[in-house]
UniProtKB/Swiss-Prot annotation:
It is found in: Cytoplasm. NCBIfam families: PRK01250.1 (NF002317). The lineage of its organism: Archaea, Thermoproteota, Thermoprotei, Sulfolobales, Sulfolobaceae. Its EC number is 3.6.1.1. The keyword Magnesium applies. Substrate binds at K26, R40, Y52, Y138. GO terms for molecular function: inorganic diphosphate phosphatase activity; magnesium ion binding. InterPro entries: Pyrophosphatase (IPR008162), Pyrophosphatase_sf (IPR036649). This is Inorganic pyrophosphatase. Homohexamer. Mg(2+) 2 binds at D67. It catalyses: diphosphate + H2O = 2 phosphate + H(+). Gene3D superfamilies: Inorganic pyrophosphatase.
Length: 173
């Protein structure tokens, strides 16, 4: 069974959760073996502020699926799939190049708590600060690794990025 980006992409997309909110372990999905593997324990004394995964059936220029941070008030199990609404994008680079993160919330039917959040600017500033702080610092103690944040993008920018990443898989770009 091959998981798709979602029937209503880019407005609502599937996210395969790799890392639960609160974890200090970086898990990664191994496509060849179809399992989630431990990549590493974070070197810093930090935990992922929200659930983290990727949109299946997408491809970024670096060859990886498009990363997503799913804003919830609870942990999601690694390997679970949740339908989300993209609300923005965090532009950043790391030691390997561009590594933007889509920011999303559960679709309204899954969790109506986030129905008022339509765009990144609808998130509380404290939540955005927490996200930026995490990504600016989570690799600090790892030799040769770094992250540089360049800013936020809107829900429209996030959806455009998703469409482009889907086209890369389907041969459109």
């Amino acid at each position: 069974m091959k998981l798709s980006p979602g029937k209503n992409a880019p407005d609502v997309v599937n996210v395969l959760v790799e890392i639960p909110q609160g974890s200090n372990i970086k898990y990664e999905y191994d496509d060849e073996e179809g399992v989630i593997k431990v990549d590493r324990v974070l070197y810093t004394s930090m935990n992922y502020p929200f659930n983290y995964g990727f949109i299946p059936g997408t491809l970024e220029e670096d060859g990886d699926p498009l990363d997503v941070l799913v804003i919830t008030n609870y942990q999601l199990y690694p390997g679970s799939v949740i339908e989300v609404r993209p609300i923005g994008i965090l532009y950043m680079k790391d030691e390997e190049g561009e590594d933007a993160k889509i920011v999303a919330v559960p679709k309204d039917k899954t969790d109506p708590s986030f129905s008022n959040i339509k765009d990144i600017n609808d998130l509380p500033q404290a939540t955005k600060n927490k996200i930026v702080h995490f990504f600016e610092h989570y690799k600090e103690l790892e030799p040769g690794k770094y992250v540089k944040i360049s800013g936020w993008g809107s829900a429209t920018e996030a959806k455009n990025r998703i469409q482009l990443a889907i086209k890369r898989v389907s041969g459109g770009q």
